[in-house]
Regions:
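Short secondary-structure transition/capping segments
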Residues: 40, 74-75, 118-119
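A surface-exposed regulatory interaction patch that couples sensing to output
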Residues: 71-88, 92
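Generic hydrophobic secondary-structure packing signal
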Residues: 43-46, 83, 94
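Extreme N-terminal segment that seeds HTH/winged-HTH DNA-binding domains in transcriptional regulators
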Residues: 1-29, 35, 85-119
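N-terminal helix-turn-helix
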Residues: 29-62
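Short, Lys/Arg-rich nucleic-acid/phosphate-binding segment
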Residues: 29-30, 62-75
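Short, mixed-charge, low-aromatic patches
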Residues: 4-10, 46-54, 66-71
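Short glycine-rich loop/turn motifs that provide flexible caps or phosphate-binding loops at active sites
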Residues: 21, 26, 49, 64-66
C-alpha cells in the first residue's frame, strides 16, 4: 500500500484496475469488505468506505445477502473515465511542454513511438 494516499482510495482503485484488466469481469463478485480488511490488515470500516465509493460510482452493486458484484458496463465506464484523466494529467502538460520546446505533433508522435519501443 502507498502510505501517501488514503487506503480506502487504494482499495477502490485496485478493484477498478482488476475490472479494467479483466480479472474481475462484469457480473463477478468482488471480495467482501471483511476479506479486504483481513487481507490488507485494515479496519473493516476503511474497506467498506472503499467499496462504497465503487457503489456510489455505479461500478459495483450490492445484492442483499449475497455480496457486491461488478455492474454491466463498468469496464467501459472506467476506461472512459481513465482516458479522460490521462488526457488531463499527462497529455495536456506534455503538449504544452512540447510546444515550448518547438516540438511539433509529428515529432512528438515519433518520440512517443521510440520511447514505447525502448520500454
Amino acid at each position: 500500500m502507498d502510505e501517501s494516499r488514503p487506503i480506502f482510495i487504494q482499495i477502490a482503485e485496485q478493484v477498478e484496475n482488476d475490472i479494467i484488466e479483466g480479472a474481475l469481469p462484469e457480473g463477478s463478485q468482488i471480495p467482501s469488505t471483511n476479506e479486504f480488511a483481513a487481507f490488507l490488515r485494515v479496519n473493516p470500516a476503511t474497506a467498506l468506505k472503499g467499496v462504497n465509493r465503487l457503489v456510489d460510482d455505479g461500478i459495483v452493486e450490492k445484492r442483499r445477502g449475497i455480496g457486491m458484484f461488478v455492474t454491466a458496463g463498468a469496464r467501459e465506464r472506467l476506461i472512459e473515465r481513465r482516458r479522460a484523466e490521462f488526457a488531463t494529467l499527462y497529455l495536456r502538460p506534455l503538449i504544452v511542454e512540447a510546444e515550448k520546446l518547438g516540438i511539433d505533433i509529428d515529432e512528438l508522435a515519433g518520440l512517443l513511438r521510440a520511447e514505447r519501443i525502448q520500454s
